[in-house]
């Protein structure tokens, strides 16, 4: 079976494990993009530590959950966001202002919308988490 969107699959795995109360989960296949999104989620405090494990194939991530995720998911299609249009997308994907975060990819790497707003750069939306 071919995965069409590994990022969406990874976030769905994390959301489902969080919903049933697990303390950790395994995300496969691993990629740099998924690792960067997990790093942003860790910096925001939504997940604990995560570790890359080489299984001889694509690799896997072992993610420690902390119980803070209500919902997370990938944003498809990957909408382009300018520096002044974050509020529009926050209203669409997040339940309230300053509750949760949008994760986007920019020319400076993967970051949250708060960091992108501070740096005054735009990018493409990857995911949301709250």
Swiss-Prot record:
GO CC annotations, alphabetized: ribonucleoprotein complex; ribosome
Regions crossing the membrane: none
**What family name appears in the similarity comment?**
Belongs to the universal ribosomal protein uS8 family.
Q: How does it assemble?
A: Part of the 30S ribosomal subunit.
Q: What does this protein do?
A: One of the primary rRNA binding proteins, it binds directly to 16S rRNA central domain where it helps coordinate assembly of the platform of the 30S subunit.
Q: Per its UniProt record, what InterPro entries does this chain match?
A: Ribosomal_uS8 (IPR000630), Ribosomal_uS8_CS (IPR047863), Ribosomal_uS8_sf (IPR035987)
**Which keywords belong to this entry?**
Ribonucleoprotein, Ribosomal protein, RNA-binding, rRNA-binding
Q: Which Gene3D superfamilies match?
A: 3.30.1370.30, 3.30.1490.10
Designated name of the protein: Small ribosomal subunit protein uS8
Annotated GO molecular function terms are: rRNA binding; structural constituent of ribosome
Q: Which GO terms describe its biological process?
A: translation
Instruction: State the Pfam families in the record.
Output: Ribosomal_S8 (PF00410)
């Amino acid at each position: 079976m071919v995965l069409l969107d590994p990022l969406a699959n990874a976030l769905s795995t994390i959301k489902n494990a969080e919903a049933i109360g697990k303390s950790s989960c395994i995300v496969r296949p691993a990629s740099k993009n998924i690792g960067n999104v997990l790093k942003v989620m860790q910096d925001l405090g939504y997940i604990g530590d995560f570790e890359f494990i080489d299984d001889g194939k694509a690799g896997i991530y072992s993610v420690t959950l902390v119980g803070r995720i209500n919902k997370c998911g990938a944003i498809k299609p990957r909408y382009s966001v300018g520096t002044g249009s974050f509020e529009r997308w926050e209203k669409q994907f997040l339940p309230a202002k300053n509750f949760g975060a949008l994760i986007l990819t920019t020319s400076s790497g993967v970051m949250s919308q708060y960091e992108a707003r501070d740096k005054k750069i735009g990018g493409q939306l990857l995911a949301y988490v709250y």
